Amino acid sequence: MRKAYCLFIFSFVYSISFAQNVAVINGKPVNTKEFLWAYKKSHNGNTPTDYEKLQAYLNLYINFKLKVLDAREMGLDKNTEYQEEIKTYESNLVARKKAGGNKDYDYLLNEYREGVLMFNVSEQKIWDKAQSDEAALYDFYSRNKQKYSKAFNEVRGDVIADYQLSLEEKWLNSLKQKYQVKINDNELKKLTKL
């Protein structure tokens, strides 16, 4: 009886804490307020009204968070240049906060930190690889030759772009296998009613 009671209490507490998040990625919650702030920022301050659009944006946001998680696991957040860049940005943000009283300070700083990490890890895993591995690039062209109507050297730019998309898709699929992602549809639906 005691175990059942403890299990009930644990389940209740978990459901309450989960309800304040739109998702959980590898045990780390994606806070509803942070997600809504990011959504509004990228949608000219508009509040979400369409569930499908909100769900599509959440999927993009989760992909972003997965890349950031991978960057942290690789130790990119420990890089001296990264830390110096963040300190410089934070100093500038503090100066603006004192001047203008920015209420979104924490969100802006976190967005910048994560954005730089996402850029750095994408550069390593996608962009540099597509630019420097000529054999892999040509192999990709050969396997998808029916898509291109011209010789490799004439469509190299298109091949690089397509190869980068392919690398990103494979990378995201591997991240989704590696890290557990749980979406809270009930919380997401509530956001369309705000």
What annotation goes with each model-predicted range?
Residues 15-19:
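Sec/Tat signal peptide C-region and signal peptidase I cleavage site
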Residues 20-25, 29-30, 36, 40, ...:
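Peptidyl-prolyl cis-trans isomerase
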Residues 4-13:
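Sec-dependent N-terminal signal peptides
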